[in-house]
């Protein structure tokens, strides 16, 4: 539903930020990493967003960097890891250290984070190692099929928007598609993204 919020930063703390967008104030839960990168209150800010919906509860999560949002979504895909724990993990360590721990098979790094036990740490590594590797291989500046992931992503976004999907829903579907498509081209990403949209 929401891709990002751009507006005046009204206030922030270690776990949330309030952004005024056109006279409407939005409260987004954030990690320590995002908090440390926020500007001063009164300045303009852009926060990438994820709307988490569960039963009758809707909560917005905000991220300064796309890499952090992608890792948040990956963590949510793991059974037993909800948004609260995913945000705690992102607050416990920088994104790079979390990825390194997963790639190097070091669960002890993760279960040092509050709320992460040995079983959860092992599950995170087991389920995310290959997906993190694929994500790193398809970052901007590296080739993925016929072009960089940034170019592929934008082309796929435009294709989905032409089909009538909002940019926000298309963005989330494309992000998931990039993580699961093998040697993705634009057609592969669009096909996978459409499947993701139908399943959500």
Curated annotation (Swiss-Prot):
Main subcellular location of this protein, as a coarse class: cytoplasm
GO cellular component: cytoplasm; Holliday junction helicase complex; Holliday junction resolvase complex
Superkingdom classification of source: Bacteria
Gene3D superfamilies tied to this protein: 5' to 3' exonuclease, C-terminal subdomain, DNA helicase RuvA subunit, C-terminal domain, Nucleic acid-binding proteins
GO biological process, one term: DNA recombination
Stretches for region Flexible linker: 144-154
Region (Domain III) location: 154-200
Compartment list: Cytoplasm
Single annotated GO MF: ATP binding
Region annotation (Domain II) ranges: 65-143
Chain intervals for the UniProt region annotation (Domain I): 1-64
Keywords tagged on the record: Cytoplasm, DNA damage, DNA recombination, DNA repair, DNA-binding
HAMAP family for the chain: DNA_HJ_migration_RuvA (MF_00031)
Free-text comment about domains: Has three domains with a flexible linker between the domains II and III and assumes an 'L' shape. Domain III is highly mobile and contacts RuvB.
Purpose of the protein: The RuvA-RuvB-RuvC complex processes Holliday junction (HJ) DNA during genetic recombination and DNA repair, while the RuvA-RuvB complex plays an important role in the rescue of blocked DNA replication forks via replication fork reversal (RFR). RuvA specifically binds to HJ cruciform DNA, conferring on it an open structure. The RuvB hexamer acts as an ATP-dependent pump, pulling dsDNA into and through the RuvAB complex. HJ branch migration allows RuvC to scan DNA until it finds its consensus sequence, where it cleaves and resolves the cruciform DNA.
Protein family (similarity comment): Belongs to the RuvA family.
Subunit structure: Homotetramer. Forms an RuvA(8)-RuvB(12)-Holliday junction (HJ) complex. HJ DNA is sandwiched between 2 RuvA tetramers; dsDNA enters through RuvA and exits via RuvB. An RuvB hexamer assembles on each DNA strand where it exits the tetramer. Each RuvB hexamer is contacted by two RuvA subunits (via domain III) on 2 adjacent RuvB subunits; this complex drives branch migration. In the full resolvosome a probable DNA-RuvA(4)-RuvB(12)-RuvC(2) complex forms which resolves the HJ.
Record's protein name: Holliday junction branch migration complex subunit RuvA
Species assigned in the record: Prosthecochloris aestuarii (strain DSM 271 / SK 413)
């Amino acid at each position: 539903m929401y891709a990002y919020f751009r507006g005046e930063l009204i206030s922030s703390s270690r776990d949330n930020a309030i952004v005024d967008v056109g006279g409407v104030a939005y409260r987004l839960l954030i990690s320590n990493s995002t908090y440390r990168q926020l500007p001063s209150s009164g300045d303009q800010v852009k926060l990438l967003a994820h709307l988490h919906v569960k039963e009758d509860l809707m909560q917005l999560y905000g991220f300064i960097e796309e890499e952090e949002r992608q890792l948040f979504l990956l963590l949510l895909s793991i059974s037993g890891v909800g948004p609260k724990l995913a945000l705690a993990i992102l607050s416990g360590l920088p994104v790079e250290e979390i990825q390194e721990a997963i790639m190097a098979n070091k669960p002890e790094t993760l279960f040092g984070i509050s709320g992460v036990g040995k079983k959860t740490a092992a599950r995170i590594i087991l389920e995310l190692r290959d997906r993190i590797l694929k994500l790193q291989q398809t970052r901007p500046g590296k080739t993925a099929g016929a072009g960089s992931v940034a170019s592929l992503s934008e082309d796929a976004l435009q294709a989905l928007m032409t089909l009538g999907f909002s940019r926000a829903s298309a963005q989330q579907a494309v992000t998931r598609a990039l993580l699961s498509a093998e040697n993705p081209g634009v057609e592969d990403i669009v096909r996978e993204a459409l499947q993701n949209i139908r399943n959500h």
